[in-house]
């Protein structure tokens, strides 16, 4: 029986892994266990957009390689409920985050995962109940 994933890797963490395949993120994945990490279809879409925007075939190939090695979770219910709650809460607080970040947070909450990122800790930490880690801050 395989261990269910515990960590959802965000776009900036996977971007760092693409830039530094033997770097800190790779070491953290190895320490956590490859079966304990996954990503969201939202993150995969953001990475693919970045590859198309750059026009770099080399970058697209690296993204293909990274994504082929990861479990990519489809966005399913009850993520929609979490999204509605998150968006309402952040709007009421007057402190919204981007739509893709809200979807990623909702996806992680619905799957019971910790979101791993770098620069976005501040905005993701405003989402009630969401566990976040910065694997590059240590």
Model feature map: region roles:
Residues 10-11, 25, 47, 83, ...:
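Generic structural signal for small/hydrophobic residues in well-ordered secondary structure
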Residues 14-15, 45-48, 73, 125, ...:
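Nucleotide phosphate-binding site architecture
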